Amino acid sequence: MMMSSVAGQRKGPSDKSAAVSEQLIAQITAAVEAGNKNLLRKLGMGSYGILYGAQEKKAMELFDPEDVHNITSLWSSFKKTFTSSRDHGNLFFHLYGVMFFMVPHVHGGEGSVKISLCSSNDPTNPVLQEKVLYFSGGAQAVLMSPTITLPFVKRGPMFYYTMECLGTRAQIPCSVVAIWKQKIDIRSAIYSKQETMSWAIEALHRPQFFQDRQEAAQYISSVYSNATSSATDSVLPFVGAQLGDTKMNVPSEARMIRSSSLRVPMLKVQSKRFSSMEIPSTSTAHLLGTTRDETVIQEESRYEEEGDDGVLFPVKKAQGLNYSHVWDNLGIESFVDVELPENWDELSVRQQVAAAMIAFANKGVCLVPKHIINRDKHNIHLENITEHNYLVILERYGIVNAGSLARTENWYNLTLAQRVEELIYQRDDAYFMFGDNTNPYPPFDCYDGLTLKVRSELERVAKEQARQRFYKEAARAQVKNKVAQTSVEEIPSTSFATKVAMESGSVDSMKIAIQAEAANEAVRPNEVMFEFGQEMNNEGATELELQQPACVASNSFFNVGVFEFAWKKSSSVAAEVLSLALPAALFGKSKEMSMGSQMLRYYDAALIMYKVILYISGMGAISGQLALVWDECNVLNRKKEFINIASLYASKHRLVSASEQSSGEFCFTPTGIGKFVPLDPASGAYDLGSIRVFVTHPLASATELESIPCHIHLQCKVLSTNIMQPPRLRAQAQFGMKPDQTHFPRFPTNQVLLHYNWGVAASMGTTLVSIFSPSGIYESDGTLQPSLLGNIARNCKWWTGTCVFEICIEKTQFHSGSLAIGLGTLNTSMSTPHDILNMPHVICNLEMGRKFYFRCTITNWNGKNLLTTGRKSSLPRPKHMSHMRLFATVLKPLVSTSIHLDTVGVTVQLKCIEDLVLGGTVSVKPIYGHWTKGKNAVDFLFSEMDLSQRKEIEKLRKENVETFDEKGKKQPQVQVPLRDKFSYGAVQYFVMNWKDEERLLVLPCAPWSVRFPQGALVQEAITCPFIDWCSSFCYWSGSLEYTIIVHRVQTSNNIGGVLNITLDSSGYPFPLGISKGTYVVSAGGGAKWAFTYGMSDNIFSFVVHDDEFFPRRHTKARAIDPNASRIMTLQDRLGNLIINLPAKDVISSLEILVKPGPDFKLQLAQAPSANHEKHLGDMQTHTYLYTPDFSELRSFEN
């Protein structure tokens, strides 16, 4: 798919053939990958063959014939799209080489094995290369390469190899492991021996064999080279039957600089059934997070993940030949007058660096690398390294292959930040001293003192400035009139259009400025879509420090409990003998529960590492086996009758024999679906899974013992806790807004959470609780007031940010007392007044002042918070699971020295949200905009029409709601500009059931909507978010993009027609709605669009540009007076859209969608339009007195 540079929308392929080609290419790629995986699954690790003495010659194919047939069939279909020649564009099978490892199993050493690399292209002479390996020589390795390619066609020739044992009577003389590199390409080639040797060294350069290329070269040198050779590690290939007799041009082992990590190559095998045989993981996450007391049980999937083009061991990218950064780092500008070794050109970069430093040292010059001198100034010391971002930091700093870097001796004693720094140091040494570009140096200066966060922000600003310059240049090119080119900045500052100020000479703070265009320095100009205007309240406030309870972690494992069970002799295979749910096992009612488990009750969420040890209390002549299984998500509990040995061994498990009596430590750290695990049983994410014990071999004994006692010792280690646990909700349906996320530097909310009178009669501990949501609704005496964020972000799903709360207490100098304001969740309970100190809180002492504010960054256990508003029928009740709670508790009762001043006013506001990030997408919420006297009995999803047309609406929605790719998840969300997030189409009008004699539709060209009478042929969509946007701002400006969806009558014999749309911006007051007329509308030279509709193309889009007749227009529809001036009818709209509707037997209905244009802007935020309870149904209050029954505060004075 390609992107349009004009509108930023996705466009499909240019024609159907291109789409078919793309689909075939994807199928071919999938078939090749499937063939490689099938081969690996069939052959195991490479090709592992056990040879039997009495067995005849054994042959192994290098590609499965069924996969060959599948790939070639798809390729033949693809070739038909661009050629008719059968032999044009064939595929070729490239075999870079096959490496064989032979391990003898005979003691005397007699006998040999003959290995042959063959091709079926010449049946009479199939052997390409052949080698006889004698068992007396021990374990040996040999490399063979065909140097040619073969056509990859159906029933065509193929590479294979044969193995045959000679001169031995042993039953199993030896075993052979073969690994190879292959590729399927449309080009043919002949490979040189040097390329084959390069692949051989890279194949050996793996954690299972060697750590670096030098080790691989040393191993080859020790086996195949003579003692007098003096070449580099750029060795030539040792291909051919005379491999052992040929003198290889490789460096002598005695003359090479030996690698410090050289070891005997060893192959380790791991499977789920034998978890004790582990291959140490070298992935970045495991390399940084492994501790000595962890037991990791994981499946080795390296062969499937790292493969490229069917390569079992992928070749690394060739390093560049320009190593100027190495010599610049040493400060070497010239090698003049420096005596260098004679074989300088044959040395590796590592050897050249060592030789250069020795040569300069002989001259009395000590070279100290710059990266060593400036190590303390490295930017990595400025980064805030946590367990959530260390992978991103390593990737941005160039660590793409941590497996090529070695662990230090004190690795397990280092913290996470120190491990990251150590990897950076090792990369710098490899890059600057050895010329190794495996982990490339980042493209920025690592010593400029800028962190990654600051650097990203600067890059974003630079890109935005460049884009702004581009837009300005494009705008100048389109303007032909020089007068129109005059910008706002060129108007003199004394002009009334620029600024009108009323100043008072005594008080500077009373200045009132009215500006035509308000500026927000924190937001980039092009991204300004919601311009809130300046705030008038500049009164100072005292900042209160939020007293957040510390997030705790345990230093070591603590005991949770001992859980006993009996292993009976009658228990059959795969029978379950114990089940222990987590984390519910931590909160049992047993008296033996430890203090550590009890302390977790004070926290809402935590990240816990579990350690499980299974003990079998049996001695003597007994046998049997148990399986200790961690069943995440309780998979084994769904169909207990189908559990068998295969399902148990496929799970994460540990086998315990009756003779062992102990399972050892079984450690795991489940996280569920979030970053933390909620400890609230009401959460669906609370149930992580269960520890289960199954019988794999029944209990047997030499005595009449019927059962033996067993017990599980459960220990925990709290890695971190999370205090705030905002609410949870099920995801809602998708419609309209994009799921990407966007950022507001500061979003003014001014949302009232509490407003009441605090009286002297309120005793200590009196608590008010407010249902709190940044997008919620304030209710007072039946009046409902939506919040600004609720109106603007009604289609967003989640938010993160720092909330700034303001507390205003209208008190005098005669009052004293203290009030605590705390933030809690549904899991928060208070039994004493001081329980509020166990949650994030602030304490307002009346002696400190009258106005206070505090900040709190609210983070849910999954890292994001839901945006929630009330439904149209009612506000959520106190037990609703979708809101946080704000508590106001009296710590010190109010004291007044005057009997007439027995109360003080208290107001708690959510002033703004800083660094607000909005993301996700949900279906539309109920509106609180221009509409009043709405329908009480109809749900908001179907309140656009009367009940008789509900089925039609459901049909329209099913046909037009956006669908998602079912093949897999989309790419992870990235932060998009504000305009990209909020520029989406929403249904504004429905038109259906018109008559043939009434086919002239007139609609206002504006973001606000007109409400037509009930039963009219045109109905507005009251769930259009632009209604709420317009009710929250005073003015709008810019262009609008319209989309018209035509619903064609499927039974019509008419194949299509032309849809005419005209923009009338003359100002004449046309009556809105459907009028009589069937003629083709003429634009008279004005803007007009004509779209052809038919069998396939039934969706049309067009843009109505702002003529800038007014700098901005009203967001509220103005009353039209036929006798008034035409200029009055254009103050709220760009004009009227006149649409000539098709005949009703061709088109059944129309959907008209509106979308903000690239320069659309809303200006000067206002209080969102409120509504009354009697028009929207019975409502519940959002403020309650904190009692067990949550008594309503209807009678509380406001």
From Swiss-Prot:
Top-level taxonomic group: Viruses
Any GO CC annotation of this UniProt entry: host cell plasmodesma
GO terms for biological process, alphabetical: transport of virus in host, cell to cell
InterPro entries: MPV (IPR000603), Viral_coat (IPR029053)
Keywords attached to this entry: Capsid protein, Host cell junction, Transport, Viral movement protein, Virion
Post-translational modification: Specific enzymatic cleavages in vivo by the P1 encoded 3C-like protease yield mature proteins.
Record keyword Ion transport present: no
UniProt function note: Capsid proteins VP35, VP26, and VP23 form a capsid enclosing the viral positive strand RNA genome. Together they form an icosahedral capsid pseudo T=3 with a diameter of approximately 30 nm (Potential).
Protein name according to UniProt: RNA2 polyprotein
Species in which this protein is naturally found: Tomato torrado virus (isolate Solanum lycopersicum/Spain/PRIToTV0301/-) (ToTV)
